[in-house]
Amino acid sequence: MAGKQNQAAPKKAVAPRQQHYEFGGPIGAFGITFGLPILVHVFNLFCNDISGCPAPSLLHPKSLDLAQLKREIGWPDNGVFGLFSWSATLWTLGYYALSLVQYRFLPGHHVEGTELSTGGRLKYKLNAFNSAMCTLAILAAGTIAQGAEFPVWTFISDNFAQIISANILFAFALAIFVYVRSFDVKPGNKDMRQLAAGGVTGSLIYDFYIGRELNPRITLPLIGQVDIKEFMEMRPGLLGWIILNCAFIAKQYRLYGYVTDSILFITAIQAFYVFDGIYMEPAVLTTMDITTDGFGFMLSFGDVVWVPFMYSTQTRYLSVHPQQLGAFGLIAVGAVLAAGYSIFRLSNSQKNNFRTNPEDPSVKHLTYLQTKTGSRLITSGWWGIARHINYLGDWLQSWPYSLPTGIAGYQILSAGSNAPGAITMLDGREVVQGEARGWGIVFTYFYILYFAILLIHRDLRDDEKCSKKYGDDWEKYKKLVKWRIVPGIY
């Protein structure tokens, strides 16, 4: 169980109120808070397994008929209320309950986080990897016994929109809970609770979105104390992403009677990303998410809605429009992945070696700028190419998530259409690209665009932070290393 560490008494009261805004300030926070949940549903409805991706009517906006569009996207007869169901909500809550039970009873190890600005360190119980393996073992056993008809897989496919809604409601409820509870934070409290510097602007919607409390914790009956932010970041959403991918593999098999290499490839590399992250769970305790950002709707929604449901778009697409990459395709996409991974790992390794052992032969030759703060800013090697060359590697690794979908887009025709080049489902329906070819890229390649924006925003935050920390030295450094992420472009 997460615990408390009382090595040092809290020194300060709460974070001082400040008016520095990100994400477009209160207006941007309002738009994101209420716009992104709609966008997640739009992606599911407009790229569907009923009529196509995108829905055919969207290709002819001038003659768009709303009634026809509703039929094409499977809009519920009872309207928006049909996007909710008690069964999906209860099973979703059951999934969270299972995560909590695993957190409580599965073995793990206890570590301390970084020192808080108010003094002291929080303790964390880390067993996300064990929890994930336990859940996947249960799902594997069910799949071995019942194959693609395993009820978990069919329930996800049949209730996908309702599961999205259940998680959206949970994200809002959790964000409201921690926001209201954050006003109980008192100076010098024994639990070492504190407010996040960026979440006390005085704007209700902005602070609700960014998060007021830095490390909100809750004590639950039979479970004990849980660090909400660390728990949500490393458990239900990340594992849920892989569970959804597996559900779409099962769906492809039910629709066609086979599974393609493209959907397996995407699932494999995304699973590697997730398992690498949860296996290295202690590393998250030093990230900005844990040490600096408050826990609000941004992280609540991102953890349990945005990551699992938007990041699984490609496998959801391929479950309906199967693509075989073949040996050449797998090698080509794998090469992009290898290039990105190499840049990311080699650059980070070089920086880490330089910081921990600057006399190491592999980094001893590197030039650097000595700052007044005592830090050394590397100006050659990987870090002489761009100030965040590791971000370039990270971004390149996002491309293999989308490339296997090809020039995306498809239409679903009724059985017996006998369309040229059609892929026929087991129930006789036919899938063709037709005039939808290329338009599906809006959905399947969205992740690449989103991730680029995320990295650029992260770079801007880092630039501002370093400018305050290093002053004139940072300006000198930027003249020596001109490019931010992509040399010659940005």
Swiss-Prot record:
Stated role: Reduces the C14=C15 double bond of 4,4-dimethyl-cholesta-8,14,24-trienol to produce 4,4-dimethyl-cholesta-8,24-dienol.
Membrane topology of this protein: Multi-pass membrane protein
Reaction(s) the record says it catalyses: 4,4-dimethyl-5alpha-cholesta-8,24-dien-3beta-ol + NADP(+) = 4,4-dimethyl-5alpha-cholesta-8,14,24-trien-3beta-ol + NADPH + H(+)
A GO cellular component annotation in the UniProt record: endoplasmic reticulum membrane
Gene name of the record: erg-3
Segments crossing the lipid bilayer: 23-43, 80-100, 136-156, 160-180, 230-250, 255-275, 324-344, 436-456
Enzyme Commission designation: 1.3.1.70
The protein's annotated pathway: Steroid biosynthesis; zymosterol biosynthesis; zymosterol from lanosterol: step 2/6
Protein name from the UniProt record: Delta(14)-sterol reductase
Family assignment from sequence similarity: Belongs to the ERG4/ERG24 family.
Chain residues that bind NADP(+): 351, 355, 378, 383, 390-391, 462, 466-470, 477
Xref: Gene3D superfamilies: 1.20.120.1630
GO biological process, one term: ergosterol biosynthetic process
InterPro entries registered for this protein in UniProt: ERG24_DHCR-like, Sterol_reductase_CS
GO molecular function, one term: Delta14-sterol reductase activity
Keyword tags: Lipid biosynthesis, Lipid metabolism, Membrane, NADP, Oxidoreductase, Steroid biosynthesis, Steroid metabolism, Sterol biosynthesis, Sterol metabolism, Transmembrane, Transmembrane helix
Phylogenetic lineage: Eukaryota, Fungi, Dikarya, Ascomycota, Pezizomycotina
Protein species of origin: Neurospora crassa (strain ATCC 24698 / 74-OR23-1A / CBS 708.71 / DSM 1257 / FGSC 987)
Keyword Iron-sulfur: no
Location in the cell: Membrane
